[in-house]
């Protein structure tokens, strides 16, 4: 990148000066194969001017708020630039941490006892206990299990009949019709 003739401390340079340098560099950019700078119509147009076209160098950052705000900006960041010009250079647009103050909760917060006290019993602790016995017998031959198995068998037979039995039965029926004719 090329250096501008204006010497400022990099950390204290206003945004307009950076925009001015960027526009200067973009206007004079030369690609590797070209000998002439780019000639874009936007730079020669009477209607449009690049952002920061009429910016004069300032002696210090304290003179930043004296700038004339009547010039028109043609930039997608117009609102951000305008607000930065009105407030002057700042550390952050959101203020500093010291200006925010502390936030105190109106309700006192208590720590969750269940997280640090293993003697407190939860309702679902029996689910994690391997030797828990609730008195039910563990018979796998129940009416519900039998109905579930019967339903699975009927669904399987129905699918087999649909995709295997129906084509076979329709082929047999077609052969019977041919023999009759």
From Swiss-Prot:
Its main location: cytoplasm. Keywords: Cytoplasm, Membrane, Transmembrane, Transmembrane helix. The keyword Kinase does not apply. Pfam families: SKN1_KRE6_Sbg1. It comes from the Eukaryota. The keyword Transmembrane helix applies. InterPro entries: Skn1/Kre6/Sbg1 (IPR005629). GO terms for cellular component: cell cortex of cell tip; cell division site; cytoplasm; division septum; plasma membrane. GO terms for biological process: mitotic division septum assembly. The chain crosses the membrane at residues 149-169. It is found in: Cytoplasm; Membrane. It is a single-pass membrane protein. Residues 32-47 have a biased composition (Acidic residues). This is Uncharacterized protein P22H7.03.
């Amino acid at each position: 990148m090329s250096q501008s003739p204006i010497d400022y401390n990099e950390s204290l340079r206003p945004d307009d000066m950076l925009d001015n340098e960027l526009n200067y560099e973009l206007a004079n950019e030369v690609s590797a194969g070209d000998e002439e700078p780019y000639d874009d119509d936007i730079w020669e147009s009477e209607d449009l001017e690049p952002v920061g076209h009429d910016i004069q160098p300032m002696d210090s950052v304290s003179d930043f708020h004296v700038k004339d705000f009547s010039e028109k900006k043609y930039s997608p960041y117009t609102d951000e630039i305008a607000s930065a010009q009105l407030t002057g250079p700042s550390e952050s647009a959101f203020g500093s941490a010291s200006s925010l103050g502390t936030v105190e909760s109106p309700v006192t917060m208590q720590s969750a006892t269940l997280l640090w006290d293993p003697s407190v019993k939860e309702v679902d602790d029996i689910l994690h206990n391997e030797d828990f016995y609730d008195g039910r017998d563990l018979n796998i031959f129940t009416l519900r299990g039998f109905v579930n198995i019967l339903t699975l068998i009927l669904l399987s037979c129905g699918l087999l009949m649909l995709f295997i039995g129906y084509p076979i039965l329709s082929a047999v029926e077609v052969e019977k019709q041919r023999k009759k004719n």
